[in-house]
Amino acid sequence: MIRGSIPALVTPFKNGELDLDTLKKLVDWQIAEGSTGLVPVGTTGESPTLSHEEHETVIEAVVQAAAGRVPVIAGAGSNSTTEGIRLIRFAERVGADAALVVTPYYNKPTQAGLMAHFTALHDCCNLPIVIYNIPGRSVVDMTPETMGRLAQLPRIIGVKDATGKIERVSQQRASCGAEFLQLSGEDATALGFNAHGGVGCISVTANVAPRLCAEFQQATLRGDYATALEYQDRLMPLHEAIFLEPGLVGAKYALSQLGLCSDEVRLPLVGLTDPTKARIDAAMRHAGLI
């Protein structure tokens, strides 16, 4: 079952190449710490700067490392429907449990174009699909009405909502039904998101604080919002500090401070400034991570 704390995994590099040994260790650590799912090659996995071959290699490596212990929701989005079909078919072939598919970016499809794109992906395979709606990056915003029509397809099972609009959860419950999975795509607002009916978060911060994020999610899902608020207060400085610069760069730096992963990223991303490093260090101390 897809719910709870689901890290959008970083993709480790070593001297410019994929570091699959470290990736597999991160998968084991995440599962041991309580993460309830994994998303390889999303935005946080630096998918824009991976080749198609690397993209597929990372998906397969995470599926193999997870070995059925938690669901793997493979990043399979593209602004080309043809490329999206290739990626989602590969994810299905290697044993992913679902695919995370971002709304096509840059070419700005209409709502009719979004319907056609996601319908084509749905019809090309038997893999469950989670829509990824992130208008801040893709420029297009899937409306609750369009999502409701897509939710009628049997394998469109949910959404990662990164609109930052908490009211969308209630609107999408109305258009898609209460059983449609709604996962927050924004760590800082995940508390309110779940209070409105969400069931989890595809998280950047969970790369660094998987146990805290998992326990936070568990508290919300059992309706214990007093405990969840205590976790929120502990994690909020880290949510903010990680995103002072691109979030995946912050997450990799924090992981490097824990001795779990290099902070190496690919251009055009660059390493953090010293003031941001200091903020992340302070937030990690506040959370009790270092």
Curated annotation (Swiss-Prot):
Fetch the Pfam families from UniProt.
DHDPS
Where it sits in the cell: the answer is: Cytoplasm
Coiled-coil zones: none
Instruction: Report a single Gene Ontology molecular function.
Output: 4-hydroxy-tetrahydrodipicolinate synthase activity
Keyword annotations for this protein, in alphabetical order, are: Amino-acid biosynthesis, Cytoplasm, Diaminopimelate biosynthesis, Lyase, Lysine biosynthesis, Schiff base
Tell me which residues this entry annotates as catalytic.
Y132 (proton donor/acceptor), K160 (schiff-base intermediate with substrate)
GO cellular component annotations of the record = cytosol
Q: Name one GO biological process term.
A: diaminopimelate biosynthetic process
Superkingdom of origin: Bacteria
**SUPFAM superfamilies the record matches:** Aldolase (SSF51569)
Q: What is this protein called?
A: 4-hydroxy-tetrahydrodipicolinate synthase
Organism name: Cereibacter sphaeroides (strain ATCC 17025 / ATH 2.4.3)
